[in-house]
Curated annotation (Swiss-Prot):
Key component of the proton channel; it plays a direct role in the translocation of protons across the membrane. Keywords: ATP synthesis, Cell inner membrane, Cell membrane, CF(0), Hydrogen ion transport, Ion transport, Membrane, Transmembrane, Transmembrane helix, Transport. It comes from Halorhodospira halophila (strain DSM 244 / SL1). PROSITE patterns: ATPASE_A. This is ATP synthase subunit a. CDD domains: ATP-synt_Fo_a_6. The keyword Cytoplasm does not apply. The chain crosses the membrane at residues 41-61, 98-118, 119-139, 152-172, 178-198, 216-236, 237-257. Its main location: membrane. Belongs to the ATPase A chain family. GO terms for biological process: proton motive force-driven plasma membrane ATP synthesis.
């Protein structure tokens, strides 16, 4: 490959992995903007749009639900709800009307976000460039802001359910008495701080890393001649069909496990 083609390939890869960014301090679109006051417009629109799609599908299923023979959509939604509810009850043993709906929301939202990775790599960016938008990432899971946002929300819930299950005093006490006993309070505190930080970091990086790698492979395959693209892209897409729900399930399952540990820990 020549130097020019290498530059073109690098430019192509960077283009597909760059967000549409709004610099709030300047009020301008800047693809190189970074910092706290920078919004990734494409991630926000795609994630909220997919969340709205999930809500609409379930609302439609509820509206069309009948006591007689259920339709295909109703069957699908009921099967998913029963599966999530059973999974949650096997992990979170306390009574809660929130955990199962929360788990269902996380699974469906992350699943739909991951599913965007199966959309043809150039289709949406080409459409957006045709209407004057230079950058557009359709895959929210390949944005650390999205994955860390989800994991930090889970972290907040861990604190809330820890206090609900143990009380404020019991939750604070567990930081210095668990797991090595009160005589090793400093060591307990250090271990618990590390574990507390590791939970959201591992949740977010696991989801981001798997989907980023998959997206990068799709981009690299798209740089090859068309006849090689089909030979390599098809089996990779088939394999990725398994990865998409698996990563959503892992994120959901770990969330429920962390909440159960926080609520039931003594």
């Amino acid at each position: 490959m020549s130097a020019d083609s290498e530059f073109d390939a690098t430019d192509y890869i960077q283009h597909h992995l760059t967000n549409l960014r709004l610099d709030l301090t300047e009020g301008t679109i800047d693809s190189e903007a970074t910092g706290f006051w920078t919004l990734h417009i494409d991630t926000l629109i795609m994630s909220f749009g997919l969340g709205a799609l999930f809500c609409y599908v379930f609302w439609l299923a509820a509206r069309q639900a009948t006591p007689g023979v259920p339709g295909g959509l109703q069957n699908f939604v009921e099967a998913m709800i029963e599966f999530i509810d059973k999974t949650v009850k096997e992990t979170f043993h306390a009574k809660s009307k929130v955990i199962a709906p929360l788990a269902l929301t996380i699974f469906c939202w992350v699943f739909l976000s991951n599913l965007m990775d199966l959309v043809p790599i150039d289709m949406v960016p080409s459409i957006m460039m045709a209407v004057g938008v230079d950058y557009w990432k359709i895959l929210p899971s390949v944005d650390l802001n999205f994955t860390f946002g989800l994991s930090l929300s889970v972290l907040a819930l861990i604190i809330i359910y820890g206090v609900m299950g143990q009380g404020v005093g019991g939750w604070l006490k567990s930081w210095v008495t668990h797991p090595l006993g009160p005589w090793l309070a400093p060591a307990n505190l250090i271990l618990n701080i590390v574990e507390f930080i590791a939970k959201p970091v591992s949740l977010s990086l696991r989801l981001f890393g798997n989907l980023y790698a998959a997206e990068l492979v799709f981009i690299l395959i798209s740089l090859l001649p068309w006849w090689i693209q089909w030979a390599l892209g098809t089996p990779w897409a088939i394999f990725h069909i398994l990865v998409v729900p698996l990563q959503a399930f892992i994120f959901m399952m770990l969330t429920v496990v962390y909440l159960a540990m926080a609520y039931e820990e003594h």
